[in-house]
Each structure stands twice: as C-alpha cells, then as structure tokens.
Regions:
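Active-site helix/loop module of the DD-peptidase/beta-lactamase fold
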Residues: 129-167, 214-246
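Penicillin-binding protein/beta-lactamase superfamily catalytic region
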Residues: 229-337, 350-358
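Active-site SXXK
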Residues: 92, 109-135, 162, 204-208, ...
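Short, well-ordered beta-strand elements
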Residues: 339-348
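Bacterial N-terminal signal peptides that target proteins for export
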Residues: 1-10
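A small/polar active-site loop signature that marks catalytic segments
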Residues: 164-240
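C-terminal motif of bacterial Sec signal peptides marking the signal peptidase cleavage site
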Residues: 17-20
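N-terminal leader/targeting segments and the immediately adjacent pre-domain N-terminus
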Residues: 22-104, 109, 127-132, 164, ...
Length: 373
C-alpha cells in the first residue's frame, strides 16, 4: 500500500493511517466483434456490496454505445498530466478504471478540498439528527473567543456562513489555513462577500464533534463511511483535516450523491431540502457554489484566491447539471445526474497548483465527451 501526499507530510500520515485498503478487481472493458451501430442498453442503478469491497459490476463501453476508439486519447492525456487514478461509473457500474505508474486500486490518496463534500453531507446528517441547525451561531459549538472578533460579531457568524464561504473573516492573513483565534479577524460583514477561505471550513469539524459529543472521524465512519462501504480516514495535516482513501471509495461517495443521499435502499441523508440546497446555488455572490460543492451551468463563478467574478459556466465542456468536489492538485469528483455518471480523478497537479477549479476540468471533459457522445 502506498499513499500520495506531499513528502513533508509523510511521517505524520504514515504513522496515523491504519485503515484497510480495498482489494478490488480490475474492470477493463471487454472487446467483441459487434456491429458498428450499437443500441445502448438501459440499466438500473447498481450499488456495490458494502461487505465485499473487491466486488463491483462493470459495463463495457460497447454495451453503452460509447466510442471506444477515443479512450486511448483520454488515457494519454491523463498520463501526461500526472494522473494516478481515474474511474467512470455509469449507473453505478464501472465503465473505465485506470491506474498509472506504480499507483494501484489499493493505494490511498489525499482528496484535498474534494473532502469538503464529505463534511457538507455530514453537517446535513447532524442537522437531520437534531444535533445542530445550520442557522445556529458557530459560537454555540465553538464557544466564546474562537476568533478575534467581538462577541457580537462572532454571534453573527452561522454554520451556514461557514458552508457558503461568506463568514466575512479576513482571508488576507499570513496563513489562510490557520484556525487559531489570532488568525480569524474581521474584514467584512457576514454574507456580503464570497471568498474561498479554508480556516472557517476546517472549524466545521469541531462544530460537528462538539455538537454530536463524539470524535469527528467516528461520527463520519458511523454515518457515511461504513454504511456505503467506503474506506479511508481524515488526518490532521497542519491546520487542515485531510481525507485519504482509494479511488473506489471516492467513487462510492459520488454514487451516494448521485442518488441524493440514499445508498441502495438505505437512506443516509434524509433531508432532501438540505441536499438540494447543498447542490444548488447557496447565495448570490458566487452562483457556482453550494454548501462546499462546486456547481456547473451557472451564469457566473468565482474561484479560490481571487475576488473577481467571471462570466459564464465553471466548466463549459461539462454537462450543465454537474456538481463536484474539486481539490488542490486536481483531485476531482464529478457527479452528473442527467447522465447517471460519476467521474473520479486522483493525482498530481496537471499544471500550476490551484486549490479547486482549474483548466484541467474543461480539457478533461472535452475528452470525456468524445467518448460518451
């Protein structure tokens, strides 16, 4: 088993990561002599077993009527852009599963900010279980003095502000990941600006732990990881709480999202209103952002590290209803309800190091379109 993460984190991670890896089977598509024109076969949604994680149904590109002769172009692009793992699910079944270099299906990789999706869903579950409400003041769970704000300013910040990147805290501090009170300084009134600020997001882990009176990893394992057969662990890396897992575990979570919080017949997130808010525009400052989810198909968007609003869709080549977890160094989890697709990409940065969206998204979807259309 190997793990992918910055070298200077290796000692910390290797001493902490004790979870089991999946031993999942290969899923190369079959080739057979068939007519040039193929009628796609409608498929019901499939859910891989949660107790036998090496078992996962596949469906061939040929059966779906996709273009197999475009797959090599995709693989070349992925390999040229430092990809470790790539998966496409259609109706829950594996269509494409490819690993590069020494990376295998059993290896674990950092999700980086794609893991924000996990935290967002866990907040929804905690609300559904009445441990908290997203309209509650953050101070209710972190106590007075969690920031350098006045008491009244602290009380004005809600969990929803943390979910939507609208806390108004100063993102120009020396370390925007720092969650110490001296790093959390007033800049703008809540709800008046959108800025991708990691520190307020990270504090949601403490909100969940204190609201549920349990360990954050334990609550996540009980409510999401174990019920859907995921493997993995959140590990503290500096101020950040980073999730590590196999690519297939990321695909499982994508499938849970695609089915709106239900795994097979087991409801995980029952609150449909929360799920809909989570995966739709959560405010009018950045239409392409829900509750820690990135959204495609909107008229404008903002990106990490910038105060500029850009016109147009976040990923023009991708379906308009796509929503996603987008992490540093191009960790990607895409869900497309209209096509019943989940797409996973793990690896290194394709070019410059960015915290979320990048040009890689649009280039990748251009190549995926050549296969599925």
């Amino acid at each position: 088993m190997t793990m992918k993460f910055p070298q200077y984190f290796s000692l910390l991670i290797m001493s902490s990561l004790l979870f089991a890896c999946s031993s999942e089977s290969d899923s190369e598509t079959e080739k057979s002599g068939t007519p040039a024109i193929i009628t796609p076969v409608p498929l019901d949604t499939y859910f891989p077993p949660i107790t036998r994680t090496d078992e996962w149904e596949t469906v061939s590109i040929e059966t779906l009527g996709w273009s197999e002769n475009q797959v090599d172009n995709l693989y070349t692009y992925l390999e040229d852009n430092d990809t470790d793992a790539f998966i496409i699910l259609k109706d829950g079944r594996i269509v494409i599963e490819k690993y590069f270099g020494d990376f295998t299906k059993d290896d674990n990789h950092a999700w980086n900010s794609s893991g924000k999706n996990l935290t967002s869903m866990l907040i929804g579950i905690a609300q559904q279980e009445e441990f908290l409400s997203i309209t509650d003041a953050t101070s209710q769970y972190l106590g007075e003095g969690w920031s350098s704000l006045t008491i009244d300013q602290e009380l004005s910040i809600s969990i929803k502000n943390q979910l939507t990147m609208t806390t108004g805290l100063d993102y120009n501090v020396e370390d925007a990941f720092c969650t110490d009170p001296e790093c959390l300084i007033y800049l703008n009134d809540i709800g008046t600006t959108w800025y991708y600020h990691n520190a307020p997001y990270t504090l949601l882990d403490d909100v969940i732990a204190n609201a549920t009176n349990t360990d954050f990893n334990s609550y996540f394992s009980e409510k999401i990881k174990e019920p859907i057969g995921m493997q993995g662990l959140f590990i503290k890396v500096g101020y950040n709480n980073v999730f590590f897992s196999t690519a297939r575990s990321m695909a499982r979570f994508g499938l849970l999202n695609l089915n709106q919080g239900t795994w097979d017949d087991t409801p995980i997130l029952l609150d449909t209103a929360y799920f809909n808010s989570m995966t739709n525009s959560s405010q009018d400052l950045n239409l392409s952002y829900g509750y820690l989810y990135w959204l495609n198909g909107k008229s404008s968007y903002r990106v990490p590290g910038s105060e500029v609003e850009f016109t147009g869709s976040l990923i023009p080549n991708a379906p308009a209803d796509l929503y996603a977890g987008l992490g540093k160094n191009d960790q990607k989890l895409y869900m497309v309800p209209s096509l019943d697709l989940v797409v996973v990409r793990m690896g290194g940065a394709s070019s410059e190091i960015l915290l979320g969206p990048s040009g890689f998204d649009n280039e990748l979807w251009g190549l995926i379109n050549e296969i599925i259309q």
